[in-house]
């Protein structure tokens, strides 16, 4: 299945000059959503993962059905102040400022093989922060899976040394 045909491009959103790649049109098509999920499940099985981790919000949309299909857990990564128990945090740079991601301190056990999922790889900052959180808890990043890789933003540079798949690639904006 060619998933690219199910991705809607929205020009000048959320700001002028951006050509937004909207995956909700994959999600609202049962066959496309199942296909994307199944592709990531097969990858995760090859990597023998124990748990899936995803940053809010679209990492949940991708990761939860994968975890469910594999009968394994899902650990959310959230913005500061959104998780109710003791957390670890990681601050990272944005184009204009910083952001902080957190996860529960007991979400990953040392030695667990982790699949990190998100909808889209852009600059790689969010996933790099997620990797830092997982590894600080002793988790092993066995694989990283995206629906979309915006290759022209060079996010893969931050993920060197990790096994990464993306189901759709855009070479140019």
Curated annotation (Swiss-Prot):
What biological process terms from GO does the record include? Answer: adenine salvage; AMP salvage; purine ribonucleoside salvage
Question: In what pathway does it function?
Answer: Purine metabolism; AMP biosynthesis via salvage pathway; AMP from adenine: step 1/1
Query: Is the Glycoprotein keyword given for this protein?
Result: no
Keywords, A to Z, come to: Cytoplasm, Glycosyltransferase, Purine salvage, Transferase
Cellular component GO terms, alphabetical: cytoplasm
Origin: domain of life: Bacteria
Task: Give a GO molecular function annotation for the protein.
Answer: adenine binding
InterPro entries per the UniProt record, alphabetical: Ade_phspho_trans, PRibTrfase_dom, PRTase-like, UPRTase/APRTase
Q: Which reaction does it catalyse?
A: AMP + diphosphate = 5-phospho-alpha-D-ribose 1-diphosphate + adenine
Major localization class: cytoplasm
Per UniProt, subcellular location reads as: Cytoplasm
What HAMAP family does the annotation carry? Answer: Aden_phosphoribosyltr
Record's subunit section: Homodimer.
- Record family assignment: Belongs to the purine/pyrimidine phosphoribosyltransferase family.
**Tell me, what does this protein do in biology?**
Catalyzes a salvage reaction resulting in the formation of AMP, that is energically less costly than de novo synthesis.
Name of the molecule in the record: Adenine phosphoribosyltransferase
């Amino acid at each position: 299945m060619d998933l690219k045909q199910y991705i809607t491009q929205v020009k000048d959103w959320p700001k002028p000059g951006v050509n937004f790649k909207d995956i909700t049109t994959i999600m609202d098509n049962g066959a496309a959503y199942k296909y994307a999920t199944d592709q990531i499940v097969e990858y995760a099985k090859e990597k023998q993962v124990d748990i899936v981790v995803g940053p809010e919000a679209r990492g949940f949309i991708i990761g939860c059905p994968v975890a469910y299909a594999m009968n394994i857990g899902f650990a959310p990564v959230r913005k500061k102040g959104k998780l109710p128990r003791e957390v670890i945090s990681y601050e990272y740079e944005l184009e204009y400022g910083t952001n902080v991601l957190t996860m529960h301190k007991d979400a990953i056990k040392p030695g667990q093989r982790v699949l990190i999922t998100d909808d889209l790889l852009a600059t790689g900052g969010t996933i790099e922060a997620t990797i830092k959180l997982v590894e600080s808890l002793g988790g092993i990043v066995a694989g990283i899976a995206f629906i979309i890789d915006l290759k022209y933003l060079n996010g893969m540079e931050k993920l060197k040394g990790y096994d990464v798949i993306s189901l759709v690639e855009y070479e140019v904006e």
